[in-house]
Amino acid sequence: MEVSNMTTVTVFILLGLSNNPQVQALLFVLFLVIYLLTLLGNLLMVLVISTDSHLCTPMYFFLRQLSFLDAFYSSIIVPKLLENLLSKGETISFLECFTQISLVIFSGATEACLLSVMAYDRFQAMCHPLLYVVIINRRVCAGLVGASWAIGMGTGLINTLLLAQQHFCGPNVIHSFACELPPVLLLTCSDPCASIVSILTTMSVLGLGTLVLLLGSYSCIIMTALRINSATGRSKIFSTCSSHFLVVTIFYTSGVLRYMIPASGSALEQVLSVQYSVITPLLNPLIYSLKSQEVKVALRRMLARKSRLPL
């Protein structure tokens, strides 16, 4: 059959997580609570960092960007999931699906870059403390964040444009609760070689590159900490970096497991998608707020200021 005679798909069908109405109602409540907590945690982190002068440091500048990105990423996936659970509708338009794919790739690539930037920031702070203020100045911070967002935007745009060149003519059922690149690529009727090469290039260059930068930064930090004779000094270094290291571990572990497993619509794949898309953005602000004494103190200061305001 020639491509010109094929029927073009205009909508996709998302299989979702369950067809049972009772389970759907339970999932709706669960994901709504998680989504609201995700927005609350991340936007509260943005507000605290933006309004507290004690947190005007490069580390918290980068953390504010990460918190905003997590709130944005969660808003790409969860609202459509809630809409489908509530309305029992499972369709998503071609344009809406590809927009979601583009934004998901953009967010993931940007977060990988931001996490590497944050590791580099900690490396400079721990290994070159006397030059830290000179090296990581305001202009450098803005440039690193701008480069992270630009790389993410370019990665999302390139992968989505290559996917849009594919022809979708037959099955339109996506074995997932959201439009993601691997399951959508299975539905193409044309040769997906260009998209596959693009995905592999993204994973090897961006994924591996940022991971190498992360591991290199933390290796230097650990070696610096081990050379310190003071147990208090070592403890302070590990305490400062532990939150970021935990966030990095969760992000890369869930991301690698999600995208290295072939798309099949299995229960494991669905669980990994939920963990990567829904749970991870919720965990990040919790990890930083629970493990950072500075954030806790800043939050208490903000609440104290609010309580003193006249009614």
Curated annotation (Swiss-Prot):
Pfam families found in the cross-reference section: 7tm_4
Keyword Transport: no
Entries under InterPro entries matching the protein: GPCR_Rhodpsn, GPCR_Rhodpsn_7TM, Olfact_rcpt, Olfactory_GPCR
GO CC, alphabetical: plasma membrane
SUPFAM superfamilies: Family A G protein-coupled receptor-like (SSF81321)
Keyword tags: Cell membrane, Disulfide bond, G-protein coupled receptor, Membrane, Olfaction, Receptor, Sensory transduction, Transducer, Transmembrane, Transmembrane helix
Residue ranges that the UniProt entry lists as topological domain Extracellular: 1-28, 87-97, 164-195, 258-269
Top-rank lineage group of the source organism: Eukaryota
Transmembrane recorded as keyword: yes
Parts of the chain on the Cytoplasmic side: 50-65, 119-140, 217-236, 291-311
GO MF term list: G protein-coupled receptor activity; odorant binding; olfactory receptor activity
Compartment(s): Cell membrane
Gene3D superfamilies: Rhodopsin 7-helix transmembrane proteins (1.20.1070.10)
TM regions (residue ranges): 29-49, 66-86, 98-118, 141-163, 196-216, 237-257, 270-290
Disulfide-bond pairs as recorded: C97-C179
Topological category with respect to the lipid bilayer: Multi-pass membrane protein
Role according to the record: Odorant receptor.
PANTHER family named among the record's database cross-references: OLFACTORY RECEPTOR
Similarity comment text for this entry: Belongs to the G-protein coupled receptor 1 family.
Protein name: Olfactory receptor 5BS1
Annotated organism of origin: Homo sapiens (Human)
Source lineage: Eukaryota, Metazoa, Chordata, Craniata, Vertebrata
